[in-house]
């Protein structure tokens, strides 16, 4: 798994899907200021990396969730990855909207899902865990047995880890914030001294003392 984490980190860096701005941080929709932005949608534009990532997702699901019957993507970023992975595994696939449609059948779950089916949620990245837990809850309310989550990248934030643990849902990520920070420094995407700042952010996103200088 450590080899996979490093390889996927190298892949994401090679296609410039990870952006570093420790001195001019990004602001997420939640208001959190972050030195890193990861755009996993760019994986879809890079066929070689896309194949590597989807193959790793297949291997991870087979290893961690061998009883999986259905893959459900998160809307919107997880949909394509769920579709490709499901195709490779010969499994049914659907996705969960962030809210119900206001027309037609007003579905929040798109695709056929039977009560009791064993589901794996496919997510592109996890930060605080809020959005993916909403998906898990929707699926559970529909009667699915959620085996867990597979994600491409996790920030490894304490809040996200605690939320998933409280909801008793397992997550397995292909790579993580710490590995990407380490590889980025080795390959000179960032300065070695910036690694500590990045990890300080990951440890406590509410503490913004890492911004604007080395610590």
What residues fall within each predicted segment?
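PRPP-associated nucleotide enzymes
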Residues: 1-122, 130-215
């Amino acid at each position: 798994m450590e080899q996979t984490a490093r390889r996927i980190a190298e892949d994401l860096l090679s296609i410039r899907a990870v952006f570093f701005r420790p001195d001019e941080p990004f602001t997420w929709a939640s208001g959190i200021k972050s030195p890193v932005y990861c755009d996993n949608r760019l994986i879809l534009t890079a066929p070689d990396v896309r194949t590597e990532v989807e193959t790793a997702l297949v291997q991870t699901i087979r290893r961690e969730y061998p009883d999986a019957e259905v893959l459900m993507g998160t809307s919107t970023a997880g949909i394509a990855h769920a579709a490709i992975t499901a195709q490779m595994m010969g499994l049914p696939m659907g996705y969960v909207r962030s809210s119900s449609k206001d027309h037609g059948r007003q579905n929040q779950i798109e695709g056929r899902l039977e009560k009791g089916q064993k589901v794996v949620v496919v997510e592109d990245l996890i930060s605080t865990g809020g959005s993916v837990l909403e998906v898990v809850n929707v699926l559970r309310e529909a009667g699915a047995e959620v085996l867990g989550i597979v994600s491409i990248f996790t920030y490894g934030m304490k809040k996200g880890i605690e939320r998933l643990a409280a909801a008793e849902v397992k997550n397995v990520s292909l790579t993580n914030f710490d590995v990407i920070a380490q590889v980025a420094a080795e390959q000179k995407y960032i300065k070695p001294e910036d690694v500590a700042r990045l990890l300080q952010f990951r440890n406590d996103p509410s503490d913004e003392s890492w911004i604007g200088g080395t610590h």
